[in-house]
Amino acid sequence: MDSAFANLDAAGFLQIWQHFDADDNGYIEGKELDDFFRHMLKKLQPKDKITDERVQQIKKSFMSAYDATFDGRLQIEELANMILPQEENFLLIFRREAPLDNSVEFMKIWRKYDADSSGYISAAELKNFLKDLFLQHKKKIPPNKLDEYTDAMMKIFDKNKDGRLDLNDLARILALQENFLLQFKMDASSQVERKRDFEKIFAHYDVSRTGALEGPEVDGFVKDMMELVRPSISGGDLDKFRECLLTHCDMNKDGKIQKSELALCLGLKHKP
């Protein structure tokens, strides 16, 4: 393996690949190959001078090893197999086949399978979890491929070998989008800016467009809020903070957080 790729992880590799494989057909072709390898080298060695000779050297090495059909193009799986460690490679392939939209969608699925709020999902539950996830994205996965994904996940992420995965494990596996709340800096904003940001935030989590956060919408908001101050949270932590949020914000005790209630909790005056 070339030293240029020693520190590359799946997230970084995927971001670069998607930039060049614009039509998402699983190939990088022609001049794109030169641009692709040049970009990767610049990303990984920002202080080094990237010469045409170095680019062609890397390109030749990859093409001779993986372009078995001599058609002048490479597949993402071939590159991943060569330059990524096993764990990151698996994450890469999985992310391409089943991207999740946001934390609300993730929590809808989590709540369906963690029905007892234990904070864990067993191997059997995981298999059903994946099946529904692929159906949600209108993808038909053969039984053998479903078994392969399930087994691989348990082997990689079930570190203590107790046959179950926690909330944080699945959040990483399913590659949730970057925390939506990271783009906002409420403390440093004026009242006008805070109100504007609040509208964006509420609209993002109010997926059902009912004017209130309920069920997985509350879960998704709580998850992102907690992760602003605590990068790794458990299912139990989420449930405790969710209960706390409802206690303080759900003024009419209907199990939902109305837009006006959340605004009040955040120190904003909301006009219906």
From Swiss-Prot:
Residues 8-43, 53-89, 101-136, 145-180, 193-228, 237-272 form the EF-hand domain. Ca(2+) 5 binds at D250, N252, D254, K256, E261. Ca(2+) 4 binds at D206, S208, T210, E217. The keyword DNA repair does not apply. Ca(2+) 3 binds at D158, N160, D162, R164, D169. It comes from the Eukaryota. The keyword Metal-binding applies. Keywords: Calcium, Cytoplasm, Metal-binding, Repeat. One of its GO terms (biological process) is brain development. Ca(2+) 1 binds at D21, D23, N25, Y27, E32. Ca(2+) 2 binds at D114, D116, S118, Y120, E125. GO terms for molecular function: calcium ion binding. GO terms for cellular component: cytosol; dendrite; nucleus; synapse; terminal bouton. It holds the Pfam family EF-hand_7. InterPro entries: Calbindin_Ca-bind, EF-hand-dom_pair, EF_Hand_1_Ca_BS, EF_hand_dom, EFh_SCGN. CDD domains: EFh_HEF_SCGN. It is found in: Cytoplasm. PANTHER family: CALBINDIN, SECRETAGOGIN. This is Secretagogin. It comes from Danio rerio. The lineage of its organism: Eukaryota, Metazoa, Chordata, Craniata, Vertebrata.
